Amino acid sequence: MGRAHEVRAASMAKTAAKKSAANGRAAKEIYMAAKQGGIDPNSNLALRSVIDKAKANQIPRDVIERAIKRAAGGDAENYVSNRYEGIGPSNVAILVDTLTSNVNRAAAMIREVFNKNKGNPDGKVNFLFEDVAMFAFKNKKEDEVLEALMSDEVEINDLICEDETIIIYAPFKAYNSVKHSLDKLNIDEYLISEIRAIPIDKRIEIKDKQTKLQLQTLLDKLDELEDVQNVYHNAEL
């Protein structure tokens, strides 16, 4: 078969593993949001957000539906959400959101990854970020999007049009109202539709290639952990 075949097979296996991990993360988020706030996304902000996020990430419909059915059926499985803070190479601030059935395991694994990859798991950096509702999509004109938002008197923080992509930032509590207005525009596909943490100040630029590689390795290792849902940072990569 040759080395080329081995490389392709390894690449396909890695892609399949990432897809499986993404499906698992989405299922946990949807299950917990539905269990805690009800299975109707129209009245459950958290559920609406994670479903939209799953769709934007191309999570299969059956994964979404099974997670909601599990919550509706009174499944006893329980997960706890936590946010961990740390510092990476070049003093980059890092937030790690987890959803786990074993808090001690999650905390220990996160500390281990930081310690083994030139990071500090004891940094306090949450104040450098804010949680916002974020949307991104193509094939719509800025004027019509603004008109839809203004007609509904929806509060947003910013609207950016860049490379034919419209990006909207809004207070995280305004997620449902913004999404309701955007739905009237019949947007075909959202590139981003979720609540996420973003840096309050300008991102840190890392010019040294080795340092940048060290940081990317740390971020990748954190993202690969079973209990990790999201990893946020304030670096320019």
UniProtKB/Swiss-Prot annotation:
Pfam families: TACO1_YebC_N (PF20772), Transcrip_reg (PF01709). GO terms for cellular component: cytosol. SUPFAM superfamilies: YebC-like. It is found in: Cytoplasm. One of its GO terms (molecular function) is DNA binding. Keywords: Cytoplasm, DNA-binding, Transcription, Transcription regulation. Transmembrane segments: none annotated. GO terms for biological process: regulation of DNA-templated transcription. It comes from the Bacteria. InterPro entries: Integrase-like_N, TACO1_YebC-like_2nd/3rd_dom, TACO1_YebC_N, Transcrip_reg_TACO1-like, Transcrip_reg_TACO1-like_dom3, YebC-like. Its main location: cytoplasm. Belongs to the TACO1 family. This is Probable transcriptional regulatory protein MCAP_0598.
